[in-house]
Amino acid sequence: MWALRGCRSGSRWGQGAALLLLLLGVPPRGLALPPLRYSHAGICPNDMNPNLWVDAQSTCKRECETDQECETYEKCCPNVCGTKSCVAARYMDVKGKKGPVGMPKEATCDHFMCLQQGSECDIWDGQPVCKCRDRCEKEPSFTCASDGLTYYNRCYMDAEACSKGITLAVVTCRYHFTWPNTSPSPPETTVHPTTAPPETPGLDATAPALLNHPAHQSVTVGETVSFLCDVVGRPRPEITWEKQLEDRENVVMRPNHVRGNVVVTNIAQLVIYNAQPQDAGIYTCTARNAAGVLRADFPLSVVSGGQASATAESSPNGTALPAAECLKPPDSDDCGEEQTRWYFDAQANNCLTFTFGHCHRNRNHFETYEACMLACMSGSLAMCSLPALQGPCKAYVPRWAYNSQTGQCQSFVYGGCEGNGNNFESREDCEESCPFPRGNQRCRACKPRQKLVTSFCRSDFVILGRISELTEEPDSGRALVTVDEVLKDEKMGLKFLGQEPLEVTLLHMDWTCPCPNVTVGEAPLIIMGEVDGGMAVLRPDSFVGASSTRRARKLREVMHKKTCDVLKDFPGLQ
């Protein structure tokens, strides 16, 4: 009993009046009442049995703070996402022991059907009712569903369908077998076998290639997102996933691997449940076999509901930042609330995540990956850094792509559609275009006016050499070239130069995005230019590329066979 102050001791009338006021909801003067707390009947499943933890994926989306936010037959209970969710309540038996209430004799679920997928019959207030399941087994049995997601097991899929009031079906998990066939057909096969891709002579092994573009995804906090690294190759590539972490070693995840809310399924699909801001970042798929290795980056942005709408409204009007801002290091100092943001990393040629402390010392910080790319990568992504992309079509055309991991051009099979810029008809074309020096990554790749042979024929001089000194001037520049070999010289008499370096004038240079992109170093270059007033001159579209034994041999063959004379007689061939 509460102590009733202000009433005469021993007065039954005073106590009765105070009790009446209390029952009417009017506390007597001087009476201290405890705060009222709204609560539904029953207990949470995890209070009844630790093994009944609320663990269905769908329950994490029905977040709550108190029972008042839930249905009358539900409780607000902790879930595996670290928050609370509305779930069906449990009850104590008549002896006070925790456990489900025994069904009254007059209530039964025997002839009561629940039509919604993922629902089950339960007795509520003496009547059978349908409710969504709030308990799933812990053992993984990855299930591919018709909504395009892979669930931890069948129960998780049913719970998702019930929470949304929809129907989800189990579908065959997508898996693309290697091409060509990894083993010969057995003798007992039919006389007319099914159509298979044609065999390509000499391609006993093919390096991994992607079937689809690695797309950026942006989700709201609490949603589920998945990435499929759809690759082919011979032999079958092994796939691993890792997240690019800030100042920490990356954790490699293989198929059938669970780490927190991140799962890699048995078909190597990466699934992130209940996405949180710290889950944003670059998720890298690595596919490896005996013929080569492929790495593809899948960016993920995780934003709140308000940020998502604001980003959708502002992204079309995004403006590029000055190059100097994009090249500044991320501002990681702590000046207040910490958030996960994106910044442009010139060395990685990509946007990465970091912990932003709101110091605002520079502008190289963005809410989403897309906003970062719009601001600091307004030009096309350097094609030589793109992964080999086969595409969904079935033309099966041999092509070449530059592999930034090995630093070499490798063959792959192109399907004929939806490829990318890292796609060349021959190894020679690939080596002519890749790699190119990485400078300001907002700049497009420098492209010469003509290809190797045509540029050779139309140039006044062609030399093999190294840049020993470079001087920048407004709209121009000067380079000192140590000449290793003179392949062509029509106007300067370079054979009399001896050991002296050749001074080359660079015309119409934009030093924020220099073309040709020459740098001081020991790497041998093929330099083709013009002669103007006795001076060696390079223009933005002049041919300057990495020298190789193959290229040098080809240019010597052009001289020996007098190919340039033939091209002069037939201009249409150039």
Swiss-Prot record:
The keyword Transmembrane does not apply. Keywords: Disulfide bond, Glycoprotein, Immunoglobulin domain, Metalloenzyme inhibitor, Metalloprotease inhibitor, Protease inhibitor, Repeat, Secreted, Serine protease inhibitor, Signal. Residues 326-376, 384-434 form the BPTI/Kunitz inhibitor domain. Residues 124-175 form the Kazal-like domain. Disulfide bonds join C44-C77, C60-C81, C64-C76, C70-C86, C132-C162, C136-C155, C144-C173, C229-C285, C326-C376, C335-C359, C351-C372, C384-C434, C393-C417, C409-C430, C443-C513, C446-C515, C457-C564. It holds the Pfam family I-set. Glycans are attached at N517. The keyword Zinc does not apply. The record marks K138, E139 as: Reactive bond. Residues 37-90 form the WAP domain. Residues 1-32 form the signal peptide. Its main location: secreted. Residues 208-301 form the Ig-like C2-type domain. GO terms for molecular function: receptor antagonist activity; serine-type endopeptidase inhibitor activity; transforming growth factor beta binding. GO terms for cellular component: extracellular space. One of its GO terms (biological process) is roof of mouth development. Residues 443-564 form the NTR domain. Belongs to the WFIKKN family. Interacts with both mature and propeptide myostatin/MSTN. Protease-inhibitor that contains multiple distinct protease inhibitor domains. Probably has serine protease- and metalloprotease-inhibitor activity. Inhibits the biological activity of mature myostatin, but not activin. This is WAP, Kazal, immunoglobulin, Kunitz and NTR domain-containing protein 2. It comes from Bos taurus (Bovine). The gene is WFIKKN2.
